[in-house]
């Protein structure tokens, strides 16, 4: 099978005016609201100051999650003056959460492009924050929409599973047999769809060969020492190479094991994240803005 996919080799996003961007965002929210399959807490979120702001940010949730994952961190950015857009990834946040395995490559491409069009009109400087599979999408968006995205914060980026989760020889099977819907769907112990995971791996295989994102000024990466789900070498090296190829500043931080935080380092429904949110959330904002910061020791 070819590793590339035509829909993932270019972007169809467009620059929108503030009014057009707001109209498109509101349409997305109302479509989620009228879709009875979408859980009420999982609808797309738009938070604006009633006008185009100096800075705007888009936040993309992880595999099998939904916008609720970023709702609270979104408030931190909003209170710092940002317009914030947190779109729901297709097939996610549904009453039957296993249906996230129904996601398709064309739907993912369309989502990334339309979401980027919306954020383009919300601020003078626009960027993206992503968690896990959302950070994978953010990496693609940054390369193919570089005239829009100037900064990215990639949290626990999922480009490939860790060897303990999926031995490396199994990754092509995950990508080709599940990612291309040849095998019926199956689920991990934490109810992640193999078909969905395979498609995120396909996205990563469609990054630009040189990873260059012209217009990118800054990339920050945060992982947790306790995260056993992702390939951490790729989680750091792909963004680092993208920053180097683009002449952008790069910063990386690993949350110490003492914090007790695993793969999801954002959502407040994770007890340890909630416990440390007063340290973590301002830290994520500073990391996004490229400040030289460290997390206060636990």
Residue ranges and their predicted role:
Residues 6, 149-198:
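Hydrolase active-site cap/lid region
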Residues 37-92:
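Short, surface-exposed "cap/lid" segments of acyl-processing enzymes
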Residues 73, 217, 231-243:
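Short alpha-helix in the alpha/beta-hydrolase fold that links the catalytic acid
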Residues 94-122:
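Catalytic nucleophile-loop/oxyanion-hole region of alpha/beta-hydrolase
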Residues 129-138:
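Gly/Ala-rich beta-loop-alpha elbow adjacent to hydrolase catalytic centers
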Residues 215, 221-227:
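Short beta-strand/loop motif that positions the catalytic acidic residue
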Residues 243-266:
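Catalytic histidine neighborhood in serine/cysteine hydrolases
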Residues 262-298:
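Catalytic active-site module of serine/aspartate enzymes centered on a nucleophile-bearing elbow/loop
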């Amino acid at each position: 099978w070819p590793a590339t996919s035509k829909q993932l080799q270019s972007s169809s996003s467009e620059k929108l005016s503030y009014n057009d961007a707001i109209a498109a965002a509101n349409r997305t929210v109302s479509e989620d609201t009228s879709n009875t399959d979408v859980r009420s807490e999982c609808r797309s979120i738009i938070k604006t100051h009633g006008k185009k702001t100096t800075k705007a940010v888009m936040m993309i949730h992880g595999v099998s999650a939904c916008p609720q994952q970023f709702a609270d961190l979104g408030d931190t950015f909003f209170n710092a003056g940002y317009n914030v857009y947190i779109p729901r990834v297709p097939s996610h946040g549904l009453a039957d959460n296993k249906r996230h395995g129904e996601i398709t490559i064309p739907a993912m491409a369309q989502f990334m492009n339309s979401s980027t069009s919306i954020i383009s009109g919300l601020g003078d400087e626009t960027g993206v924050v992503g968690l896990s599979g959302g950070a994978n999408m953010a990496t693609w968006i940054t390369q193919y929409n570089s005239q829009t995205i100037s900064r990215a914060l990639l949290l626990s980026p999922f480009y490939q599973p860790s060897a303990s989760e999926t031995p490396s020889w199994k990754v092509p099977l995950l990508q080709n047999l599940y990612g291309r819907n040849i095998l019926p769907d199956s689920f991990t112990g934490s109810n992640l769809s193999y078909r969905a995971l395979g498609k995120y791996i396909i996205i990563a295989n469609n990054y630009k060969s040189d990873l260059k994102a012209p217009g990118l000024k800054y990339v920050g990466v945060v992982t947790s020492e306790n995260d056993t789900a992702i390939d951490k070498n790729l989680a750091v090296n792909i963004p680092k190479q993208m920053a180097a190829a683009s002449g952008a500043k790069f910063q990386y931080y690993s949350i110490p094991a003492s914090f007790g935080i695993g793969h999801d380092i954002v959502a407040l429904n994770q007890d340890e994240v909630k416990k440390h949110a007063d340290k973590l959330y301002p830290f994520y904002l500073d990391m996004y803005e490229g400040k030289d910061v460290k997390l206060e020791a636990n």
